[in-house]
Structure formats: C-alpha cells, structure tokens
Amino acid sequence: VTDLAHLPADITPQGFIDAIREAMAGETVPATASAQKAVLVLDGDGGGSWTMGFVGGKLQIDEGLAAAPPVRLTSTVDSWRALVVGRIRERMAEAVGKVAFDPRALARVFHDGARVEKINAFAGDLRLILEDTEAGAEYAVTVTLGGGEPNLAAPTTTVRITMADAVALARREDNLQAAFFAGKIRIEGDFNLPMGIMGAMMS
C-alpha cells in the first residue's frame, strides 16, 4: 500500500491517482452521499484530467472530464507537485509534523448531499494563490463551481496568502478571521463567492 505521507519525489499525477484509488479501496460512504461528480485537471508535463465520484458506495476515479461537473479543480503539475511532495508539503510538515494528503477528508465533502446542493447554488471561478516569497514562486488552483467552463484568465475571485501566513494558520498561531482583517488573506474580485462557499461548508 502506498504511504501517502511519503510519496516518491518523482511520482506522476497518474501514479498519485492510483495511490488514492488504493487508499480508498476499503472505504464506504453513507447513503446520504451526493451522486455528483468532481473533476481534477492538471496542466503540464504528465498532466491530465480525472472525474471522481461515488458509485455503489465506493469512490470511483475515471480518466477524462464529466459533463458540467459542479466542482472542477484546475491547476498545474508544478503546483500539484509542490503540494504533494514539494515546498508546500515540506513547510507544512515543519509546522505541524507529519503531513499526508488525506483523500478521505476530501471525500467527506461529498458525504453530505445536502451540503453539496448548497455549494451547487454558487457559480464562478475561485482562484487560490499561495505566494512562496522565499522560493520566488506562486502555487495556484482554480475552483470552478456551477458546471461552467473555467475562466482562468479572469476568475470571479482571487484569494492570495503568503506561505508564511499559511503556515501560521496551520500552527493555529492565527485564525482565518484575524488573518483576513490583518490583510494577510487578500481577496480580489467578488467578495461574496468565497464568503458564501465558506458559509455553506460550515453549515
């Protein structure tokens, strides 16, 4: 079984998807789980697209794009690699100890069908950018809601935070509200989209 906390540095996106399939093979989901699909798109060398959702009480991941998915994540292979085996993972591990990508946590979002329906009420592109000033790099993912095609050139809302401030949040040295009012979380564009999503996730 692949250890998601110690993935090989040269793992490919497809190898990562295979590791998630393996980790989730024995997991079952409640009857309240949503039948909606989510899509992951990684652009760049070795990238691809995958559709994931629950079928027969199990997580199923297929290559390709589902039509009009309610949630679509678009990123680059470089940003993904920073998250699972690179800079983001290293800094978070320093902050909170052992770090592993937990597919169960992501899957739990879809366990509550009613919550997914609330998220379905939103439409637009939410771009999240992590600024790594020490490395002179930025890592980004765009979350597209509502089933439309992503507008990567002009997202509805962009949220920015530095790596140092993200680490402080992970350590619980700061909280989201305080970080926002201190200007550490910067929102450009439609303020209502991220606030509405946060409200739906917490309800």
Protein language model regions, located:
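Feature captures hydrophobic
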Residues: 1-203
